[in-house]
Amino acid sequence: VLMTNSDVVVMVDDGWKDLWSLRNENPLNDAETLRYGVKGQIIELGKKPNSLSDIDGQYTGLIKISHHKIKDFISFYDQLDRFILYEGREFKQMYMTTFLQLLIDAGWTIMPARVNHGWLEVDTVDDLKLYERLSEEGKLDVLWKVNE
């Protein structure tokens, strides 16, 4: 993420489907869209996908804002309407992907720092138990190498 040269960078896992397939019988049930434009920038994220072709990768939740853009980033956030719904959610419960899509729609360029695995998504206790079991069985290395 630090090595990607852009004012706004988010980490994207290109190998997301392996992880989602472990966590869900149908990966589309929990995955979100993420689409790249012709220059490699992210043009869409955070929507419900209709098919795997709607997903170029998965946003991992990690974001970098350059020091000279942070004031604009905060200002954009502060100027959002507090009284409307954002993707069906009140302002204070807005998803980060919704906020990022608003930035994209306003003309901001968001670039991906692309990885292939190297992180884990833990949304539930069941996710954690799954990873603990896979680690004990020596099968977690396919997604995340603990000793590197």
Regions found by a protein language model. Give the residues of each.
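Conserved core of the sugar-phosphate nucleotidyltransferase
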Residues: 1-76, 80
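Conserved alpha/beta core of the MobA/IspD/sugar-nucleotide pyrophosphorylase nucleotidyltransferase superfamily
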Residues: 52-148
